[in-house]
């Protein structure tokens, strides 16, 4: 037995076997060779026959687990747990590291949502840590500039960053550590540097031209006049100073101190509309997660302005079909998922907005009765023609993470600056980009999501949690703009309808509808032909856009933690 101090860390491991490792065929010839081959297969070097969707196992561990989109961040979370911190402490530490190592995806210039399972009270808590539009920004500003929509980048897209206040709310209510402890690993990596991975480098390079338009952004993210190369060590002294200020002064250092004053001063000089009251008046909101059941499992999401109810609407519609009998990624299954998505997104575009500014019919939208009425609109033999044209929220960059600790506290957290490097603007020398979440507003007067001063925009982000018989079962999320509700639906169907484990559920081929139906490799040519016969416009997916997934399950029988992560990103699950 291992003592508490020297328990081994459990890693998901790939084993590559070269021919030199295998025994040389015996003189007996083919029969001996086949014997050795059977022996090698018997020792586990072949993919299990039951796992056509995955090339690696779930991670399984007894004590604590972290699933994050970057290995360094996941390891930091485990270090926090082993140092005596709980899941909430670890989640904030992981998020801070992700803001450094995946700066195009997230950071303190962005917003977050979280769902917390508190083991002591045995209930879920939701946190909406999203920011609002500046007090001085209104639709007339855009009219004077002859703009009929909010741009995708620049100062007119800025909303107050909510992440730091979200961290403070999480640590104050449920954490055991302070900012100095949880930010220390990110500060160290920012000062000493970290090597840039291949996936991140490619996404970083895609924003080179727009980052170069802002001298402060270029100084931060284009060292030596270019994006870092694969394997090159990147340091961020500006973000280190920002994190150190938060570590010393807490959330007020960001919203009432020098950081806020620097952002406001930069805004005033560069065509923005931020004022100090925008930051001083900012606060996160604890909310009741909303829920609906899917085949006996209770699925929990954050209410609007999050898009969480969209996944619940899709699942409610699909529950009326025997999906398992139709087959995984069959034409029939993909058709139903796509048609459910069209209906749910039509409702999202009409009803998902800032709940503080609108009366929203959330309970009605996620009711089984409403789902039955919407389901009746689906023609199982023909694709509907009601396809939304154009979507300003489609290019979203986000990180999702989840942590479960030894006491079975759990956190499901998603954080984002929206587009790649957000607004593309780094304020002064603070070391992070401000989000472009304001581009999610409509400029249509009377629309529930219409831009107003001090209002939250529609958010694509949505962490999720699943309980079974009142007990915590699954903490998961699928980052990636409008893929999120579609990803939640497909992952849960993979697990519940098709019996996949967490790794299989994430690795399996996905589909995404956004006018055209994109399908990943693994969807057969015959299925594509049948989908086209039904009236769908189909193309093979390429270049990303299918989301990134992390999940941790608390096994209801053994109590063990099972984890899965997405091969589409640099994700890693680590347990101990």
At which residue positions do the language-model features occur?
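Short, small/polar residue-rich loop motifs at catalytic or cofactor-binding pockets
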Residues: 286, 395-398, 459-461
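Bacterial N-terminal signal peptides that target proteins for export
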Residues: 1-12
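Noncatalytic scaffold domains of N-terminal-nucleophile
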Residues: 30-75, 87-249, 254-256, 260-306, ...
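Active-site rim segments in enzyme catalytic domains, especially the processed small/beta chain
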Residues: 100-107, 111-126, 274-275, 409-474, ...
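Alpha-helical support elements that line or immediately flank enzyme active sites
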Residues: 80-81, 165-173, 249-256, 261, ...
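Bacterial N-terminal signal peptides
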Residues: 11-23
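Internal maturation/activation junctions in enzymes
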Residues: 44, 320-417, 430, 437, ...
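Extended C-terminal subregions enriched in glycine
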Residues: 407, 455, 488, 497-544
């Amino acid at each position: 037995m291992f003592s508490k101090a020297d328990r081994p860390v459990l890693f998901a491991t790939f084993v590559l076997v070269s021919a030199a490792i295998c025994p040389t065929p015996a003189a007996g010839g083919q029969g001996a060779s086949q014997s050795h081959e059977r022996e090698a297969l018997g020792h586990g070097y072949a993919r299990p026959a039951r796992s056509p969707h995955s090339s690696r196992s779930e991670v399984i561990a007894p004590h604590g687990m972290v699933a994050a989109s970057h290995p360094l961040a996941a390891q930091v979370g485990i270090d926090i747990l082993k140092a005596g911190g709980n899941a909430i402490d670890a989640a904030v530490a992981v998020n801070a590291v992700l803001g450094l190592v995946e700066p195009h995806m997230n950071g303190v210039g962005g917003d977050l949502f979280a769902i917390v399972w508190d083991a002591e009270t045995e209930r879920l808590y939701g946190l909406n840590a999203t920011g609002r539009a500046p007090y001085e920004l209104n639709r007339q500003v855009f009219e004077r500039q002859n703009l009929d929509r909010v741009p995708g980048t620049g100062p007119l897209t800025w909303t107050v960053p909510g992440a730091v206040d979200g961290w403070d709310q999480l640590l104050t209510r449920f954490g055991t550590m302070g900012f100095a402890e949880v930010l220390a690993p990110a500060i160290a990596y920012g000062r000493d540097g970290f090597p840039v991975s291949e996936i991140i480098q490619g996404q970083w390079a895609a924003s080179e031209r727009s980052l170069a338009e802002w001298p402060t952004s270029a100084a931060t993210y284009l060292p030596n006049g270019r994006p870092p190369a694969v394997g090159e060590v990147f340091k961020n002294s500006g973000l280190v100073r920002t994190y150190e200020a938060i570590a010393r002064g807490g959330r007020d250092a960001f919203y009432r101190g020098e950081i806020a004053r620097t952002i406001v001063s930069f805004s005033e000089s560069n065509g923005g509309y931020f004022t100090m009251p925008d930051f001083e008046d900012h606060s996160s909101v604890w909310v009741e997660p909303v829920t609906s059941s899917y085949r006996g499992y209770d699925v929990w999401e954050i209410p609007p302005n999050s898009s969480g109810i969209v996944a619940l609407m899709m699942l409610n519609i699909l529950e009326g079909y025997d999906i398992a009998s139709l087959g995984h990624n069959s034409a029939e299954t993909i058709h139903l998922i796509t048609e459910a998505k069209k209906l749910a997104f039509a409702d999202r575009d009409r009803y998902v907005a800032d709940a503080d500014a609108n009366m929203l019919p959330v309970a009605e939208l996620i009711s089984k009765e409403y789902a039955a009425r919407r389901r009746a609109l689906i023609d199982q033999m023909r694709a509907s023609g009601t396809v939304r044209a154009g979507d300003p929220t489609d290019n979203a960059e986000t990180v999702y993470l989840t942590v479960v600790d030894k006491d079975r506290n759990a956190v499901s957290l998603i954080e984002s600056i929206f587009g790649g490097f957000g607004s593309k603007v780094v304020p002064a020398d603070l070391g992070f980009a401000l989000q472009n979440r304001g581009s999610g507003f409509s400029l249509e007067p009377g629309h529930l999501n219409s831009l107003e001063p001090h209002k939250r925009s529609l958010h694509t982000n949505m962490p999720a949690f699943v309980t079974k018989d009142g007990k915590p079962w699954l903490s998961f999320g699928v980052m990636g703009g409008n893929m999120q509700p579609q990803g939640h639906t497909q992952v849960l169907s993979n697990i519940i309808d098709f019996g996949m484990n967490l790794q299989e559920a994430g690795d399996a081929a996905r589909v995404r509808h956004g006018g055209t139906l994109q399908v990943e490799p693994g969807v057969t040519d015959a299925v594509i032909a049948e989908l086209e016969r039904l009236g769908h416009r189909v193309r093979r997916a390429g270049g990303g856009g299918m989301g990134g997934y992390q999940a941790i399950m608390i096994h209801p029988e053994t109590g063990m933690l099972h984890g899965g992560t997405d091969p589409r990103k640099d994700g890693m699950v680590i347990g101990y």
